UniProtKB/Swiss-Prot annotation:
Keyword Endoplasmic reticulum in record: yes
Record annotation: effect of changing residue 21 to K: Abolishes interaction with OST3 and STT3; disrupts interaction between OST3 and STT3
Sequence ranges on the Lumenal membrane side: 1-9
Molecular function terms from GO: protein-macromolecule adaptor activity
Name of the protein: Dolichyl-diphosphooligosaccharide--protein glycosyltransferase subunit OST4
InterPro entries according to UniProt: Oligosaccaryltransferase, Ost4p_sf
Keyword Chloroplast: no
Topology in membrane: Single-pass type III membrane protein
Cytoplasmic side stretches: 29-36
Organism for this UniProt entry: Saccharomyces cerevisiae (strain ATCC 204508 / S288c) (Baker's yeast)
Predominant place of localization: endoplasmic reticulum
Length: 36
């Protein structure tokens, strides 16, 4: 059984990773295909 502390740290880590991937994706997307 997962404890609350493990679940909390897992959720925070997952959230940070997702935000980082989204930011990187948008940065690469705007760099590779500049909007005219």
């Amino acid at each position: 059984m997962i404890s609350d502390e493990q679940l909390n740290s897992l959720a925070i880590t997952f959230g940070i990773v997702m935000m980082t991937l989204i930011v990187i994706y948008h940065a690469v997307d705007s760099t590779m295909s500049p909007k005219n």
